[in-house]
A protein has these predicted regions:
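Basic, glycine/lysine-rich polyanion-binding surfaces/domains
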Residues: 1-150
Length: 150
């Protein structure tokens, strides 16, 4: 990857989960500790069946009063359906924001040039109000920018 290039990932979609119970809801259903997710730290997680079989994987990034879920665009409807099954009486809202946000990738070097960026897996900063996270799977994968299309 050229260090100054930005690549739009057309195969990625964005779900936004917000509401009073959003943190507890995610903590109870995904494979990573949501308590570690903050304005400065993101995580990689999966959703499994009750029997422990893999269903989906995604990156969770804190944004405003909720969480962005960066997932495969072709699975977004199935993931939202599954999340709604687990929603029950939780005070949350689950929105497909794929038409309003794009996922882009920048080089690790470009990420580290951003203000307050650290060379730590999952480190998250803001750029023009949009979150940019050093990929929580491996920092060598670069930064992931969730950019508002407006």
């Amino acid at each position: 990857m050229e260090k100054d290039q930005i690549f739009i990932l057309k195969d990625r979609g964005i779900i936004y989960i917000s509401g009073e119970d959003a943190k507890e809801f995610l903590q109870n259903i995904v494979t990573n500790d949501i308590n570690k997710v903050s304005d400065t730290s993101s995580c990689f997680a999966s959703l499994l069946t009750p029997q422990g079989k893999y269903l989906f994987d995604f990156i969770i990034i804190r944004h405003k009063q909720g969480y962005f879920v960066d997932c495969e665009k072709n699975q977004i409807d199935q993931l939202i359906d599954r999340l709604n099954i687990y929603k029950l009486n939780s005070k949350i809202e689950i929105l497909n924001l794929s038409n309003e946000f794009e996922v882009a990738v920048i080089s690790k070097e470009k990420f580290l040039a951003l203000e307050n960026a650290k060379d730590i897996v999952g480190n998250t900063v803001k750029y023009n109000g949009d979150p940019v996270a050093l990929d929580p799977r491996s920092k060598n994968l670069g930064g992931r920018l969730i950019a508002n299309l407006e």
